């Protein structure tokens, strides 16, 4: 019935396709002649001998995902008419074991030289079908995939006839390329038996410990003066209310003691070269001004170096806000973040140090730990794999001016609340109003402060853990301040984790008041410094004007300020919001599109501590596989230079984003040479080459031209 409908159509495009089908035998004859020069050109850069193409086409139903939107039998009959097609079949689930068996049997029985599978996205199942092709006895790179699901049936599910015709086009294009595909062979490169973890928060520490436990030398690079990250600033963790430092400090100590971990604090990645298995990373160890015992010993100072006694800090006359305490407590120009730092090593802030020399005198002639003339040091390390665990920053909530942060003293962020309520914080764990030091008895928590914000000022995404830590804060004030009432202004309470919903019920039972509605404005009473919170209660459908003593903003989180620079160094993509982009959100959440580079923690997107640690362990496991194997295979999608055409202009060398190209002297002239292990097959060089001297393996110019012809000319030459 589908064929009859097509015969009666009056559309020009439909008539064109029908005419193409009628002339199939003629096309077959022309096609046999046409590939001769193309095959010769493709084979020029070291591929296999030309042979007559015998292509097998396999059409997947994908249940009803594909078959429900198009006429599979009509598509199958059309595929039989295409030049070079020797076999056509269809199956309900081609990716299943029986489906792959269909491919294998057909290849062997019909002596096929290439395979085209018409199914879903190659991003999902290309490796599956490539393996099936290889097991059937064909070079796996003689496989081509036609996407007739994501790019067809799913978007044309209500246009059965149009979807059917589009599937025919997709298969015709894929067959045209498959007829010209050549044997390609992966390259094997050795892997350096070391790894690097960038960022030493809880994710980076866990990843480094797992790698070290697997016997892998690990360089742990942290830009701050000590390890621990954001978790070291927290008082308690939800929903178990464990002391954050109590569960984090042992892990920090383990990192400091691990012989297989080279801990590099106050250090940043400066440059990256190389590829999976052979990354050459240059790190910049910032001038610290204080010697470690090992550094002192290397200078001949026996028994010297910093021991964390604090004598230097006591005499330092320079005072500035302490970043670890979110500016609510002072620190000196020579300082440590907190008493439990790892490594226990003071740091001089040379931006504020006046070099008075008092710290040198206080340190004494025995330790000689102070070096006021120290300079930045650049160190090169070679590693096989890399894990990025760079963490996050707090969204500058002062940008949302309606909430009065940094205008009103008694409007604070959740991180400031954490330090105020923490026993090691600036107030010794006593929650007080910044304006007058009084204990607040009515506290408003504003959730989604900057999150789920489509105004263009805040962030459109959910920061995931704000709801839960605000519930934790509500518990802490009811526990520490009898009679204090927490008011929680929320949009939705997202208690998604294990025991989170139960924790939510517990906070309700403890007396917290919940008002569903976004806070529109906060104003201060200039006399009392109390705050009026204005919102709409969407459950009771009435406006709210609530006077409170303190407002806590659950500020959104965002990628760290240097995330963009770091990701570019390692060739990692990012999302629209700046979070590092995983290779696949479901199937490869720890990997990236750059082989050998993995992600862990919040740098990939907002997540709580359990999810962060779990991803860190997954990233460590993935990063250890190439190292333990000792070598890796690189897919042969490399640029290839046709030296007879190369003019040695060097344009491609300057354009290559991966530094994979160079000019070399050959037969008295310069020609382009590819470092195949660095090449990602992006095609930039080939697109810009003025002489057409660069082709991409598996995407050679004749193959692309054949696809274009198949689409525009219906396969006619």
Predicted regions and their residues:
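Residues forming the flavin
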Residues: 1-8, 12-717
């Amino acid at each position: 019935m589908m064929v009859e409908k097509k015969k009666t159509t009056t559309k020009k495009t439909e008539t064109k396709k029908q005419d193409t089908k009628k002339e199939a035998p003629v096309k077959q004859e022309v096609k046999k002649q046409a590939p001769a020069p193309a095959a010769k050109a493709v084979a020029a850069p070291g591929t296999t001998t030309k042979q007559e193409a015998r292509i097998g086409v396999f059409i997947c139903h994908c249940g009803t995902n594909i078959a429900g939107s198009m006429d599979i039998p009509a598509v199958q009959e059309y595929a039989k008419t295409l030049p070079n097609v020797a076999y056509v079949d269809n199956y309900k689930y081609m990716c299943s074991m029986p489906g792959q068996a269909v491919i294998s049997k057909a290849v062997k029985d019909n002596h096929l030289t290439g395979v085209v599978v018409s199914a879903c996205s190659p991003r999902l199942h290309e490796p599956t079908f490539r393996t099936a092709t290889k097991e059937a006895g064909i070079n796996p790179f003689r496989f081509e995939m036609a996407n007739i699901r994501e790019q067809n049936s799913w978007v044309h599910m209500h246009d059965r006839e149009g979807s059917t015709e589009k599937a025919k086009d997709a298969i015709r294009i894929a067959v045209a390329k498959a007829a010209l595909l050549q044997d390609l062979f992966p390259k094997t490169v050795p892997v350096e038996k070391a790894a690097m973890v960038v960022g030493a928060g809880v994710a980076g520490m866990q990843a480094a410990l797992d790698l070290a436990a697997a016997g892998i030398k690990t360089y742990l690079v942290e830009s701050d003066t000590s390890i621990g990250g954001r978790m070291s600033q927290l008082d308690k963790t939800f929903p178990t209310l464990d002391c954050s430092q109590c569960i984090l400090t042992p892990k920090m100590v383990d990192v400091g003691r691990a012989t297989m971990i080279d801990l590099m604090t106050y250090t940043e990645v400066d440059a990256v070269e190389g590829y999976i298995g052979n990354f050459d990373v240059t790190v910049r160890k910032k001038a610290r001004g204080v010697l470690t015992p090992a550094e002192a010993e290397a200078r001949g100072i026996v028994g010297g170096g910093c021991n964390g006694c604090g004598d230097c800090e006591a005499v330092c006359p320079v005072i500035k806000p302490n970043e670890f305490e979110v500016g609510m407590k002072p620190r000196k120009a020579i300082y440590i973040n907190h008493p439990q730092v790892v490594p226990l090593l003071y740091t001089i802030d040379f931006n504020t140090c006046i070099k008075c020399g008092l710290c040198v005198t206080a340190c004494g002639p025995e330790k000689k730990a102070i070096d006021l003339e120290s300079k930045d040091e650049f160190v090169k390390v070679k590693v096989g794999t890399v894990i990025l665990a760079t963490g996050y920053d707090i969204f500058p909530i002062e940008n949302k001016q309606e909430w009065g942060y940094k205008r009103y003293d008694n409007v604070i962020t959740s991180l400031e609340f954490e330090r105020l309520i923490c026993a090691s914080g600036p107030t010794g764990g006593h929650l007080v109003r910044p304006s007058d030091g009084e204990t607040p008895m009515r506290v408003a928590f504003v959730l989604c402060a900057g999150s789920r914000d489509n105004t263009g000022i805040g962030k459109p995404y959910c920061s995931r853990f704000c709801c839960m830590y605000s519930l934790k804060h509500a518990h802490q004030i009811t526990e520490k301040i009898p009679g204090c009432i927490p008011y929680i202004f929320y949009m939705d309470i997202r208690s998604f984790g294990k025991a989170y919903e139960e924790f939510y019920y517990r906070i309700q039972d403890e007396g917290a008041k919940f008002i569903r509605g976004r806070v529109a404005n906060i104003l201060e009473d200039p006399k009392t410094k109390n705050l009026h919170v204005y919102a709409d209660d969407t459950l009771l459908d009435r406006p709210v004007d609530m006077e409170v003593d303190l407002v806590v903003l659950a500020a959104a989180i965002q990628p760290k300020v240097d995330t963009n620079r770091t990701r570019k160094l390692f060739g990692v993509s990012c999302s629209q919001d700046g979070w590092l982009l995983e290779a696949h959100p479901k199937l490869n959440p720890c990997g990236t599109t750059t082989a050998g580079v993995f992600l862990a923690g919040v740098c990939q997107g907002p997540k709580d501590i359990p999810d962060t640690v779990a991803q860190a362990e997954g990233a460590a496991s993935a990063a250890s596989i190439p190292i333990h194997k000792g070598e890796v295979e690189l897919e042969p999608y490399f640029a290839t230079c046709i030296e007879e055409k190369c003019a040695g202009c060097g344009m491609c060398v300057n354009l290559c984003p991966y530094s994979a190209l160079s000019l070399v002297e050959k037969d008295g002239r310069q020609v382009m040479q590819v470092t195949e292990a660095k090449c990602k097959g992006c095609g930039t060089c080939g697109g810009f080459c003025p002489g057409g001297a660069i082709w991409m393996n598996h995407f050679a110019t004749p193959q692309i031209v054949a696809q274009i012809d198949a689409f525009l000319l219906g396969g006619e030459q």
